């Protein structure tokens, strides 16, 4: 092939790939248009097709305007801003034949917009989704925050691996009754529970789980991704059945506890380590903290104080559980 022909062919391929990537189907009759978001951007040319065997007397309208926008089985529009998005409908003789909804995914300075969810500032990386697992069963919960109250829709998909995805099923997204306050502003918390179908608790993980949240606010589309191994998101439930046993002729007591009911078994294989801490009046913490691998410890327990215990995977530095506590009095 002549070099000039090769360059022309390559350029044509790039144009084709670009046009394929800038509009794609999110779900049936819902399309996402990817736009460079700056004043001089030309926008994207979108061709809508009326899904009908009819050929003649077809007209088009949109939710933004009751005027007839065009006629024929296809409608070509230029999408540059949110006013160009929305629902487009084709009709014949007053009868609706099909509808197409256009959403916009903004890219500013090469970065996709993240306006819908609240960034959770708990690490050097930008985190919008947080996921936790109580054990190694393959079941985990993810959540996110938003200040938006209306015209909001979420959907979640998940898999382990990319080239050969394994089945991870996620349930319906639910709005939590919990309200989270950050920087003097209230945020709504949404959660979803997922389960890996073929999880083997004792197997070594070689491929990460990926969770993708599709978020829609009015006509704006965004997606958020979290990738992790189950071992990295483990956070046990707090220890249970805390009890104090006074020791004769001593200021010390023996505090005992049990593994949380939700933790993986057998405990001889899925072992936890525990930290014990005395906490004084008004929740004033003492700096000393005793960490043990067994389910009891001897500590000083002053009147009006309390003893609290937390747990973590013994062999992997994942998250500590929340505290469980028992009163000294």
Swiss-Prot record:
Q: Which UniProt keywords apply?
A: Cytokine, Disulfide bond, Glycoprotein, Immunoglobulin domain, Secreted, Signal
GO cellular component terms listed in the entry, alphabetical order = interleukin-12 complex; membrane
Q: GO biological process annotations for this chain's record? A: interleukin-12-mediated signaling pathway; natural killer cell activation; positive regulation of activated T cell proliferation; T-helper cell differentiation
Q: Where in the cell is it found?
A: Secreted
The Fibronectin type-III domain extends over: 238-329
| Coiled coil start-end | none
Q: Which residues are glycosylated?
A: 135, 223
Q: SUPFAM superfamilies given for it?
A: Fibronectin type III, Immunoglobulin
Where's the Ig-like C2-type domain?
A: 29-106
Q: Which molecular function terms from Gene Ontology are attached?
A: cytokine activity; cytokine receptor activity; interleukin-12 alpha subunit binding; interleukin-12 receptor binding
Q: Which InterPro entries match?
A: FN3_dom, FN3_sf, Hematopoietin_rcpt_L_F3_CS, Ig-like_dom, Ig-like_dom_sf, Ig-like_fold, Ig_sub2, IL-12
> What residue range is the signal peptide?
1-22
SS bonds (residue pairs): 50-90
Q: Which Pfam families does the record cross-reference, listed alphabetically?
A: IL12p40_C
Q: How does it assemble?
A: Heterodimer with IL12A; disulfide-linked. The heterodimer is known as interleukin IL-12. Heterodimer with IL23A; disulfide-linked. The heterodimer is known as interleukin IL-23. Also secreted as a monomer. Interacts with NBR1; this interaction promotes IL-12 secretion.
Recorded family membership: Belongs to the IL-12B family.
Could you tell me what this protein does?
Cytokine that can act as a growth factor for activated T and NK cells, enhance the lytic activity of NK/lymphokine-activated killer cells, and stimulate the production of IFN-gamma by resting PBMC.
PANTHER family annotated for this entry? INTERLEUKIN-12 SUBUNIT BETA, INTERLEUKIN-12 SUBUNIT BETA-RELATED
Q: What is this protein called?
A: Interleukin-12 subunit beta
Query: Which lineage do the record's taxonomy fields give for this organism?
Result: Eukaryota, Metazoa, Chordata, Craniata, Vertebrata
Q: Which gene encodes it?
A: IL12B
């Amino acid at each position: 092939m002549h070099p000039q022909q090769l360059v022309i062919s390559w350029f044509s391929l790039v144009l084709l790939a670009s046009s394929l990537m800038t509009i794609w189907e999110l779900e049936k009759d819902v399309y996402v248009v990817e736009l460079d978001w700056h004043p001089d951007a030309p926008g994207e040319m979108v061709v809508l097709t009326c899904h009908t065997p009819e050929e003649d007397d077809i007209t088009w309208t949109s939710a933004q305007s009751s005027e007839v926008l065009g006629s024929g089985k296809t409608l070509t529009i230029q999408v540059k801003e949110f006013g160009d998005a929305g629902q487009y409908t084709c009709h014949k003789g007053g009868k609706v034949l099909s509808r197409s909804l256009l959403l916009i995914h903004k890219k500013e300075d090469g970065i996709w917009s993240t306006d819908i969810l609240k960034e959770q500032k708990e690490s050097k990386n930008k985190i919008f989704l947080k996921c936790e697992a109580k054990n190694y069963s393959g079941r985990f919960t993810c959540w996110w925050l938003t200040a938006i109250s209306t015209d909001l829709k979420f959907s979640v998909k998940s898999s382990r691996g990319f080239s050969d995805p394994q089945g991870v099923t996620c349930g319906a997204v639910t709005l939590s009754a919990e309200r989270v306050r950050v920087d003097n502003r209230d945020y709504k918390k949404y959660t979803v529970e997922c389960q890996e179908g073929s999880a083997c608790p004792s197997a070594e993980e070689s491929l990460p789980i990926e969770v993708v949240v599709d978020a829609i606010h009015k006509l704006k589309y965004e997606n958020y991704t979290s990738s992790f191994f189950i071992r990295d998101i483990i956070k046990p439930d707090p220890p249970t059945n805390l009890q104090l046993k006074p020791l004769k002729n001593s200021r010390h007591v023996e505090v005992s506890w049990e593994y949380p009911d939700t933790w993986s078994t057998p405990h001889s294989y899925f072992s936890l380590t525990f930290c014990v801490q005395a906490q004084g009046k008004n929740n004033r913490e003492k700096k000393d903290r005793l960490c043990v691998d067994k389910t009891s410890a001897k500590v000083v327990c002053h009147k009006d104080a309390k003893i609290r215990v937390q747990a973590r995977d013994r062999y992997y530095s994942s998250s500590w559980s929340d505290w469980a506590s028992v009163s000294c009095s």
